[in-house]
């Protein structure tokens, strides 16, 4: 019997679960299929915004990179504060602990780089009763600063809620995407395929299905598919969702099928 693994790829909105693969898993299970669901998007975000990975990113920064951008140079000077606060910030965003919210709203706790410069007067916006919302806002600025660091030193394709969107919009031709796929995987993509490999080993699927709701998912899907073709050539790969059913359906270049076995349009035809 087929064993399916349904994956939400990097990156979708991180402040609420994206339900497509969970709904599809439930439907397939009721139909008697063996199916599992995995949110690779949130797992990779949790991995990237951790002390371990952040330390690696800072250690890999070069003087040339820092010298080109005062914003990044400012962040590098605050590296120890970022390393000492990142796990607390992520714990708060996952659990919403009010004690942590109060700590975060203390103006001395979070390191502040360029994104904070335009934050405005927080008391005016949140008052005394909006501590949790204020903390979420500050954490968002903090993570946006770190995203700028990743984009400036690791890969230009990174954003918290999308990956490689600009290059993925270059349809109907596949050449730009394939040129990117010929490049070595960057550190973010290495973390992504490491997480994928763990799930493949745990589930042992015969078919992996990716949902692609947005253009900012396509490059990550193709990187995962490329890895699966290299390491697990017997696994078949399918892709569906909002993006293939709309803009991507105009693609005429069949080279995409070197990576994806099936592209599912609309409701599955």
Question: Where do the model's predicted regions map?
Answer:
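Generic preference for hydrophobic/aromatic residues in regular secondary structure cores
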Residues: 86, 143-146
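Glycine-rich beta-alpha loop elements in corrinoid/cobalamin-binding modules
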Residues: 11-14, 18-51, 90-120, 125-130, ...
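A short, charged/proline- and glycine-enriched loop
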Residues: 1-4, 203-204
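Conserved phosphoryl-transfer catalytic core
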Residues: 47-106
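Nucleotide-activated donor-dependent transferases that construct or modify glycoconjugates
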Residues: 3-13
